[in-house]
Amino acid sequence: AYVLKDTVMDILNETKADKVNIIAHSKGGLDARYMISSLGMAEYVASLSTISTPHNGSITMDNILKLPNILIKIGAKLADVWFKILGDENPDTYKVINQFTTIATKKFNENNKDCSNVYYQSFAFVMKNPLSDFLMFLPNIIVSLFEGENDGLLAPRATKWTNFRGIYRGNSKRGISHLDEVDLRRYKLSSQRGD
C-alpha cells in the first residue's frame, strides 16, 4: 500500500492530473483499499476497480488453516518457490494466507470502509473446469471442494464488493483463471528482446 501510494503520487506529479483510476488484481485490491482508506489517499483516487480481490476472505483458507501448522508452513514455502519463479522477489505465502481468512478480512473491512468520494466496483471470474489452466488445476479442485466454482484461487463470493459487476466466464471452453486475469502466460510468451 505504501509503494502504491508513492506510485500514485509520482503519476499525479508527472501528469498533473487531479486523480487516478486504479484497476487492482487479487491482493492488490486490498492494498489499494488500505491506501485509500487508511493512508489518506481518497482525495487522489477517482475510482477503484477490483479484479478477483478477496474482499470477504476465503472459506478455503479457513479450512486449510485447520491443518497442522507444520504442513501449512511446508506448503507455504513450496508456494514461495513457485512465486519466485513467477517473478515475486520476496513472497511470504504463510503471512498472506493468514490475511485471507474470513475473520481477517472482516476485520480489514471494518477498518477500511469505502470512501464516499471514490467510485468502487468489483468483478469475479471463474474457470469452467480444473483442466482450464494447468497451473491452477490443483488449487481449482481444492477451492471447488469448499466453495464451488472459482478462478483457481477465489470463489465469486470472496470477491463481491461495492458495485459488484458479476461473474465473468469467458467465451471459450476454458473460462478465465486467476492467471488469465492478468494475462500472465501471454505476457511471458510475447515479451520482446533486443530493443
PLM regions and their residue ranges:
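N-terminal non-catalytic accessory region
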Residues: 1-69, 189-191
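Helical cap/lid subdomain of alpha/beta-hydrolase-fold lipid enzymes
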Residues: 42-195
